[in-house]
Amino acid sequence: MKRFFFTVALALAAALPVTSHAVALDAPLACTESGHQFIADLAQQQLIDPKPTRVESNSINAFSPTSGADLTAYGFHIFAVVGYEKDDPMFRVGDGEPLARSAYGVVVFGSESKVQGAITAAGSTAIVHRVAPLITAIFCKRN
């Protein structure tokens, strides 16, 4: 999983969207949704490209924000959105074991400690994972 987020970070860092207005994704990152609902809602609002830019062996699909979309999570800038739902045609399947039946999240610019502090203060049960210095994943999963 660390390899995935690092790859996403490097690939998308140069493709940051042009700012128009910020859309906060704090509520869905309280981990009360399915991977399908999270990704479908963002795609329907045209905030992410509905086709994944990358699929990891654990079936996590990475989606890019659309041009002009300024997505935030707990005050941190989002540069990648990830998700997966088992047996859902919206997602492509990797060649390994899926991470979970349903999973979703975002990759943000921010230190692990600051992101963890913001998530804890908000009462979210999301998992925080350091990808690289100042690049952190916020992740929700259901088995």
Question: Which stretches of residues belong to each language-model region?
Answer:
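N-terminal secretory signal peptides
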Residues: 23-81
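C-terminal partner/receptor-binding element of secreted or periplasmic proteins
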Residues: 116-143
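Short, extreme N-terminal segment that most often corresponds to the first beta-strand
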Residues: 23-31, 106-107, 136-143
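Bacterial N-terminal signal peptides
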Residues: 7-15
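Positively charged n-region of N-terminal signal peptides that target proteins for export
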Residues: 1-4
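Short, ordered beta-strand-loop transition motifs
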Residues: 53-59, 95-101, 127-135
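Long, charged/polar, surface-exposed segments that mediate recognition or autoinhibition
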Residues: 65-121
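Sec/Tat signal peptide C-region and signal peptidase I cleavage site
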Residues: 16-22
